[in-house]
A protein has these predicted regions:
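Buried, small/hydrophobic-residue-enriched core segments of structured protein domains
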Residues: 1-34, 41-43, 79-80, 85-94, ...
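Gly/Ser/Thr/Ala-enriched C-terminal appendages of enzymes
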Residues: 2-31, 35, 45-46, 283, ...
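N-terminal, Lys/Arg-enriched amphipathic/low-complexity engagement segments
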Residues: 33-89, 98
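Short amphipathic alpha-helical segments
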Residues: 53-56, 138, 432, 436
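Short coil/turn segments at secondary-structure boundaries
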Residues: 72-73, 141-145, 159, 452-459
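Short acidic, Pro/Gly- and aromatic-enriched capping/linker segments at domain boundaries
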Residues: 97-103, 411-416
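Hydrophobic residues within beta-strands of alpha/beta enzymes
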Residues: 198, 262, 290, 312-314
Length: 483
């Protein structure tokens, strides 16, 4: 959590330290390595994902320190030499880190984060890097799908009670805001990140009173400027809305106040909201908002709108905060190159599964934008030494079907990654969550509608430069011959 005194350095898998210990005791101690984080598949078979979690990764790297009790525990495992234990005792982070800014639209196989530094240190980042980026990117991506389904209607994140632990509630709400939610019910997220919080009452409030009318009346008297009543504790149409209207008339109207709205948390939302809207309008409360909740997701929201539901705002909980339709984001962290005697040596991982064959070497991901429309045309991954000029036509091609080629012109090429750390020193200014959310909206708006479809979206092109494609295939051929 923000400003937490809890030291998360030891959120590591054991093999990270056993490998680091092995490197420490070999002639590779000073080896400089390059690692990339990337993902292979968009959640929910979608067309794109949203990058999130970088701020928390930075917090982790800023506070990397092995406490005395950590050192004693590691010593007790009898796996590490005394010299390596001493190295950890005086650990000083000294890596370079590049990352795609939070809120940016991202696609499979392109490097989201690149780490350059001593192999021992770069290895140690794997677990926390993946935990942080995978979780928040998953939730931000799910939130964005839900927000788009709502077609401009506000979506509030209401999921803290159903999250997989307090950290998931706290950071999940942050990611949901990045993805486009207008607020959260989680107070700590609101406090720490400066985002809007929202909430009114639970069914227990109504049940505590002798009758629904008294519960509503008491609440309206306490909160006349933000009166939103939960009307489905007993019967929405027969008691909830009639009692709400009565309280609006008797409590708010004499004060010159207008109700904020009503909330419905059960039943056939489409049918009930149509009836509720008419009842409120007939009573003179056409400005009274109707908020609905109840295990919503992008598909239910889309269907409700299609069926003519009269909904002004949505409160989405469990299916957002847990991304229940897709359990994991699937990001991985792989070695891409090492430096020896000033020379960069690209590395590749080969698999029988073609999707798991990595892209070797030091790389730069670029995004090409159409100058006239501002829409994203394609992403291109080049070698670290290449540049894409916006002043001349550029040929892109499908890395798997190389005969599929296209020449693009009248475009602007932008690097996706920015440098975050220089030799262990933070050089990046962390933006506020509200600014990240604004950036996210601009990013999604830069995509063609075909890419944002829920079902069978158009596959956005992530291509390799000719030089990088040749490098990859030369390594594949070289290693296959050795086999």
């Amino acid at each position: 959590m923000k400003n937490s005194k809890l030291n998360l350095t030891m959120i590591m898998d054991l093999y990270e330290l056993t490998m680091a210990n092995g490197i420490f005791n070999s002639d590779m101690r000073d080896t400089v390595s390059y690692f990339d984080m990337f993902f292979r598949r968009v959640p929910d078979k979608g067309g794109y994902a949203i990058m999130a979690g970088l701020e928390q990764l930075i917090e982790y790297m800023e506070n990397l320190k092995f406490e005395p009790e950590d050192i004693e525990y590691l010593r007790s495992l009898n796996l590490f030499c005394d010299e390596f234990i001493d190295y950890l005792k005086d650990f000083k982070f000294c890596c370079d880190v590049w990352a795609v800014p939070e809120g940016t639209v991202i696609f499979p196989h392109e490097p989201i984060i690149t780490v350059r530094g001593p192999a021992m240190q770069a290895l140690m980042l794997e677990t926390m890097l993946l935990v942080t980026i995978n979780h928040q990117s998953l939730i931000a991506t799910k939130a964005n799908r839900i927000v788009r389904a709502a077609q401009g209607r506000p979506v509030m994140e209401f999921g803290a009670r159903r999250a997989h632990g307090n950290g998931a509630a706290y950071y999940g709400a942050r990611a949901a805001i990045i993805g486009g939610c207008t607020g959260t019910s989680c107070l700590l997220t609101g406090k720490d990140f400066g985002v809007k919080v929202s909430g009114t009452m639970a069914h227990s409030w109504v049940q505590l009173f002798d009758d629904e009318y008294t519960a509503f009346k008491t609440y309206a008297e306490k909160y006349p400027d933000s009166c939103l009543l939960l009307v489905d504790t007993y019967n929405v149409l027969k008691s909830g809305i009639p009692n709400a209207i009565k309280v609006f008339d008797e409590v708010l109207k004499p004060l010159g106040k207008r109700p904020l709205g009503i909330r419905i948390d059960s039943g056939d939302i489409t049918y009930i909201t149509k009836k509720a809207r008419k009842m409120l309008d007939d009573a003179g409360y056409s400005d009274c908002k109707i908020c609905v909740s109840n295990s919503l997701d992008e598909y239910l929201i889309r269907d409700m709108i299609f069926q003519g539901a009269k909904v002004d705002t949505y409160g989405v909980g469990e299916r957002l905060i847990t991304a229940s339709s897709e359990a994991v984001f699937g990001g991985v962290y792989k070695l891409s190159a090492v430096e020896k005697n000033g020379e960069i040596i690209p590395k590749i991982k080969i698999s029988e599964n073609a999707a798991k064959i990595t892209i070797p070497g030091v790389k730069i991901p670029w995004r090409l934008y159409d100058r006239e429309t501002g829409k994203a045309i394609a992403d291109v991954i080049t070698t670290g030494s290449e540049k894409i000029s916006s002043d001349e036509p550029y040929e892109i091609f499908d890395p798997n079907h190389t005969w599929k080629r296209k020449v693009v012109d009248n475009f602007v090429a932008k690097k996706l990654q920015v440098k975050i750390y220089e030799k262990g020193k933070l050089i990046y200014e962390i933006p506020k969550v509200k600014d990240i959310a604004k950036h996210c909206k601009e990013q999604v708006d830069s995509l063609w509608d075909e890419v944002t479809r829920f079902e069978n979206p158009h596959t956005y092109y992530v291509d390799l430069s000719e030089e990088l494609w040749n490098l990859r295939h030369s390594l594949l051929n070289k290693l296959r011959i050795k086999e």
